[in-house]
A protein has these predicted regions:
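A short, Lys/Arg-rich alpha-helix, primarily the initiator
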Residues: 1-22
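Helix-turn-helix DNA-binding elements, focusing on the entry/boundary residues of the two helices
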Residues: 15, 26, 42, 57-60
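Residues in the recognition helix of alpha-helical DNA-binding motifs
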Residues: 18, 32, 48, 77
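Residue-level detection of the helix-turn-helix DNA-binding "recognition helix"
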Residues: 20, 34-35, 50, 61
């Protein structure tokens, strides 16, 4: 099994938290990310949320945009 970092796991937890706060499914979030120009499937969203896939700076930018949050919100403990 691939090792993950605390930051990767933290981002996954926050993505799931904000997705659920918005009442979205993983499929809903994937669709919104695609509209924003970031091609992530539901499966990739699931891997990010479970901490098994790192996110790029571009993807982080798009999560912030789609959720309508700040970078501080995403990285806050």
């Amino acid at each position: 099994m691939k090792r993950t970092t605390p930051l990767t796991r933290h981002i996954g937890v926050k993505v799931r938290e904000y997705r659920l706060k918005n009442g979205w499914t993983q499929t809903d979030l994937a669709a919104r990310m695609q509209v924003a120009g970031c091609d992530l499937s539901r499966e990739i969203i699931a891997r990010i949320e479970s901490g098994f896939r790192q996110t790029s700076v571009f993807e982080i930018d798009k999560f912030v945009e789609v959720f309508g949050i700040t970078y501080n919100d995403l990285f806050a403990q």
